[in-house]
UniProtKB/Swiss-Prot annotation:
It is a multi-pass membrane protein. Keywords: G-protein coupled receptor, Glycoprotein, Membrane, Receptor, Sensory transduction, Taste, Transducer, Transmembrane, Transmembrane helix. InterPro entries: GPCR_Rhodpsn_7TM, TAS2R. It is found in: Membrane. Its main location: membrane. Pfam families: TAS2R. Glycans are attached at N7, N167, N186, N195. The chain crosses the membrane at residues 14-34, 61-81, 91-111, 135-155, 206-226, 254-274, 282-302. Residues 35-60, 112-134, 227-253, 303-333 are cytoplasmic. One of its GO terms (molecular function) is G protein-coupled receptor activity. This is Taste receptor type 2 member 123.
Length: 333
């Protein structure tokens, strides 16, 4: 249980950092979705990779926007967290949103692997020719894990909320502390309330590790494919930096960035849930929450830099902003 009051300097630092992350996430994911949708309207068709990127950007845009809405709700209605229905509804919403965010990113890695990797295996070629169906099957199969996750969370929520209601002395004297703990613990919003959270950790970690493992396998297979391709180029005495090699490298950069950010996210999720004694130090708590929000927000800029169309669109926006700034300076605004 938490027993100390929040230091206002820590709370101020936490709030400023989180607001910057939220604004950055809204701009980043909103930009990806806007560029792809405008291109879709212009060309009247959209590629498979752009479909995945757009769905991923919209999912994370909603996630980041919901964080801002929840902050405003808790500021305007500080007694809102006492309602068990609100706890359950927000928990389910963030689980669903986080689920599709992670699995769509996994689908992106699998898509790059099947499109770029070169293997003569008949099963791989079968999947390569049916990459759209493979992605659809992955999404549909992930719904099974989503259902199990929601059911597990629902069962656990009943015990956690009951424990919270039965121990009103825990946070009724300091609702601000409960609000921040509840609000920014990602899809595990009630784990920091009771000391029994370590019981639920293996179940929650399982749902998190499944897409991570799939992405890791795709990443390793891409490395193996690049190694084979590089050896083939050496035998044929061709330039190592051919089109296929560059495609491998770009795909590896995209998948690796996801794995790195996701590994950091999982690390701090485990720290936040498992080491409850450590989390009594408010500095560690703040750092844990901020680190958890970095993953879905910072990944948008990795996607922009890794996609030629998005990168060119971002470069075209920057000169416009500079020109607008110069015009405003000229007008004395």
């Amino acid at each position: 249980m938490f027993s100390q009051k929040i230091n206002y300097s820590h709370l101020f630092t936490f709030s400023i950092t989180l607001y910057v992350e939220i604004v950055t996430g809204i701009l980043g994911h909103g930009f990806i979705a806007l560029v792809n949708i405008m291109d879709w309207v212009k060309r009247r068709r959209i590629s498979s990779v752009d479909q995945i990127l757009t769905a991923l950007a919209l999912t994370r845009f909603i996630y980041v926007l919901s964080m801002l809405i929840c902050i405003l709700l808790f500021m305007l209605c500080p007694h809102l967290p006492r309602r068990s229905e609100m706890l359950s509804a927000m928990g389910i919403f963030w689980v669903v949103n986080s689920h599709f965010s992670i699995w769509l990113t996994t689908c992106l890695g699998v898509f790059y692997f099947l499109k770029i990797a070169n293997f003569s295996n008949s099963f791989f070629l079968y999947l390569k020719w049916r990459v759209k169906k493979v992605i659809l099957i992955i999404i549909l199969a992930s719904l099974i894990f989503l259902t199990l996750h929601i059911l597990s969370l629902g069962i656990y929520d009943q015990f956690s909320i009951a424990a919270y209601v039965g121990n009103m002395s825990y946070s009724l004297t300091d609702l601000t502390q409960f609000s921040s703990t509840f609000l920014f613990s990602n899809s595990s919003n009630v784990f920091l309330i009771t000391n029994s959270s370590h019981v639920f950790l293996p179940i929650n970690s399982l749902f998190m590790l499944i897409p991570f493992t799939v992405s890791l396998v795709a990443f390793l297979m891409l490395i193996f494919s690049l190694w084979k391709h590089h050896k083939k180029m050496q035998v044929n005495a061709k330039q190592p930096r051919d089109v296929s090699t560059m495609a491998h490298i770009k795909a590896l950069q995209t998948v690796f960035s996801f794995l790195l950010l996701y590994a950091i996210y999982l690390l701090f999720l485990i720290i936040g849930i498992l080491n409850l004694g450590l989390m009594e130090k408010i500095v560690i708590l703040i750092f844990d929450h901020i680190s958890g929000a970095v993953f879905p927000i910072s990944h948008s800029f990795v996607l922009i830099l890794g996609n030629s169309k998005l990168r060119q669109a971002s470069l075209s926006v920057l000169p416009c902003l500079r020109c607008q700034s110069k015009d405003m300076d000229t007008m004395g605004l």
